[in-house]
Amino acid sequence: MFASTEIRLTFCQDRPEPREDDSYGVVVQESKPALKVPPMYKVVMFNDDYTPMDFVVEVLEKFFNLNRELATKVMLTVHTEGRAVCGMFTRDVAETKAMQVNQYARECQHPLLCEIEKDG
């Protein structure tokens, strides 16, 4: 009915001679995985002849968290140079932001376009 359990604690310095039931192993230290910095992607906004400048500023404020002044500067770069970088993100975040901007622009009936490009 009753099981008996024997617990034996031994320490290497206390034991003068090895016993036949002892087992010796290798001490393994876990190494931390080497993490690489993920590649970054630019979200690029392209100019068109139909989207109002105020809408572009609104999009930059809403989806890229830019303040009014910086959003206006990016909008003017898009307007004068034909394109501008709205931000740098990891691939998943960049794809999501570009998709959100494109979807929001379509819902508001504007042809505004964002795409992603690998940095470097």
Swiss-Prot record:
This is ATP-dependent Clp protease adapter protein ClpS. The gene is clpS. Involved in the modulation of the specificity of the ClpAP-mediated ATP-dependent protein degradation. GO terms for biological process: protein catabolic process; proteolysis. InterPro entries: ClpS (IPR022935), ClpS_core (IPR003769), Ribosomal_bL12_C/ClpS-like (IPR014719). Binds to the N-terminal domain of the chaperone ClpA. Belongs to the ClpS family. Coiled coil: none annotated.
